[in-house]
């Protein structure tokens, strides 16, 4: 078994360095990706509650100026009056890795440099690829032969995760107790009911509820935490998309979205569901998908009690109560609470149906619609009722069916008090009171209250006319 040693993790350990020559070779998209990776690693350290030195390289990246190395930052950050060392946890003996006199960084056999010690942030270091401790776990594929530029595109990046991160809740080294700790969100916002795992995240969020709101969008009134968040929000409203995919030309308003999209072209899907074998390009997608099998919906709306499998779905639902609609169609002016709803709506104007079935050539506007349609060809029915064993092609069909067992009828007619299991059934029923008949036969002009009656009429009365 590899002998473990303990040392201090520095910002440099999670930094990617470039020489001036390497930096000049990068195009704007690559430079933007570099900034995002560096800032993300910096924020991850800060989220642990660690006091970091005021690195001017971070300020430069926030201001989008031209950094290329953190070497100078490390020189400024060194403390000449302090010893640093690694301790053999088996023998208890310590050995210095930097003395007061020399004050030079020492790189160990694994290529990790010991520099400025960070309080409460220590790693256990072994000869393999896993570094773990009570506060931080570091999972890195380290290779001295990989250049910084290659590291960006090959995915050999540093990920920092701790007891307050949910990204790696299914990581094999975590115990059940640690996983349970990760899932807990003890910090709740009294204004909105939103919950957080990290104590520092709550005051950051509560800024949007305070009277002092300097970062407010003058168009919609939305308040964000900082100027970068306001700039990002403004790009959403204006439709600005500065990041372009070189393969297909698709544009994105965030560099992270571009990086995620590029996996479509490379076919990279490293995360696999053990239940059904489905693969995903991101671990967050896998975690969200697995809740289909476990039926887990931990995110509850404090207003109406509705539950969701992810916080993003809850956030989008919350806008129904607030009436907030951030996304506006430039064609017709219609506004939407979710970006995906706007994207779906825009396809109506363009008439685009990019997803085509290889079996019957039928085309669809959405990938999900194609996936559901293909189940008609392959007979796949992945959603099963635990009460009676009946299977369905769509989760919405399963949810609708389960109301038969529960007896739930949440949709009530305000006119006569009759209740229904589905909203569509209520809408059909209300036409009795309103007299509405929206389905008109273009052959004879007869009108119908229900689409099924209209279809039946065409087949029985005008079948010959329609076929000719």
Swiss-Prot record:
SMART domains tied to this protein: KRAB, ZnF_C2H2
A Pfam family the protein falls into: zf-C2H2
Function: May be involved in transcriptional regulation.
Gene: ZNF766
Protein name: Zinc finger protein 766
Alphabetical list of InterPro entries matching this protein: KRAB, KRAB_dom_sf, Znf_C2H2_sf, Znf_C2H2_type
Stored CDD domains: KRAB_A-box
GO biological process annotation, one example: regulation of transcription by RNA polymerase II
Subcellular location field: Nucleus
Keywords linked to the UniProt accession: DNA-binding, Isopeptide bond, Metal-binding, Nucleus, Repeat, Transcription, Transcription regulation, Ubl conjugation, Zinc, Zinc-finger
Transmembrane segments: none
Organism expressing this protein natively: Homo sapiens
Gene Ontology annotations for the cellular component aspect, listed alphabetically: nucleus
Glycyl lysine isopeptide (Lys-Gly) (interchain with G-Cter in SUMO2) cross-link, chain position(s): 75, 157, 179, 367
Signal peptide: none
């Amino acid at each position: 078994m590899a002998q473990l040693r303990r040392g201090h993790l520095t910002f440099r350990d999670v930094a990617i360095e470039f020489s001036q020559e390497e930096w000049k070779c990068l195009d704007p998209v690559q430079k933007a990706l570099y900034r995002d990776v560096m800032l993300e690693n910096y924020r991850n350290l800060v989220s642990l509650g660690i006091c970091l030195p005021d690195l001017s390289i971070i300020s430069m990246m926030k201001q989008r100026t031209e950094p290329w190395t953190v070497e100078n930052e490390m020189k400024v950050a060194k403390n000449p009056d302090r010893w640093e060392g690694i301790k053999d946890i088996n023998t208890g003996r310590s050995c210095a890795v930097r003395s007061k006199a020399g004050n030079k960084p020492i790189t160990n056999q694994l290529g990790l440099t010991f520099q400025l010690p960070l309080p409460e942030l220590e790693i256990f270091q072994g000869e393999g690829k896993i570094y773990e401790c009570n506060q931080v776990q570091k999972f890195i594929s380290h290779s001295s032969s990989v250049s910084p530029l290659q590291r960006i595109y090959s995915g050999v990046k540093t990920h920092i995760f701790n007891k307050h991160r949910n990204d790696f809740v299914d990581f094999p080294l975590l115990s059940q107790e640690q996983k349970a700790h990760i899932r807990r969100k003890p910090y709740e916002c009294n204004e909105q009911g939103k919950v957080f795992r990290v104590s520092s995240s709550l005051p950051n969020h509560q800024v949007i509820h305070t009277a002092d709101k300097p970062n407010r969008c003058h168009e919609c009134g939305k308040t964000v935490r900082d100027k970068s968040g306001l700039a990002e929000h403004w790009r959403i409203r204006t439709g600005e998309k500065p990041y372009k995919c070189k393969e297909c030309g698709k544009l994105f308003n965030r560099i992270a979205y571009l990086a995620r999209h590029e996996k479509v072209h490379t076919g990279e899907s490293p995360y696999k569901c053990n239940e059904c074998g489905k693969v995903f390009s991101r671990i967050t997608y896998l975690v969200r998908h697995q809740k289909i099998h476990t039926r887990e919906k931990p995110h509850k709306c404090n207003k109406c009690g509705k539950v969701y499998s992810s916080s993003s779905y809850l956030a989008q639902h919350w806008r129904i109560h607030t009436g907030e609609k951030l996304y506006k169609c430039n064609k017709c002016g219609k506004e939407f609470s979710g970006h995906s709803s706007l994207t779906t709506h825009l396809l109506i104007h363009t008439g685009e149906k990019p997803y085509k079935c290889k079996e019957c050539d039928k085309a669809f506007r959405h990938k999900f619609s194609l996936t559901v349609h293909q189940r008609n060809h392959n007979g796949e029915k992945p959603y099963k009722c635990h009460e009676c064993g009946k299977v369905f092609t769509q989760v919405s069909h399963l949810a609708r069916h389960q109301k038969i067992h529960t007896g739930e009828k949440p949709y009530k007619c305000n006119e006569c008090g009759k209740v229904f299991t589905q909203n569509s059934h209520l809408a059909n029923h209300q036409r009795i009171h309103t007299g509405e008949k929206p389905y008109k036969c273009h052959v004879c002009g007869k009108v119908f209250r229900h689409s099924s009656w209209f279809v039946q009429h065409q087949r029985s009365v005008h079948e010959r006319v329609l076929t000719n």
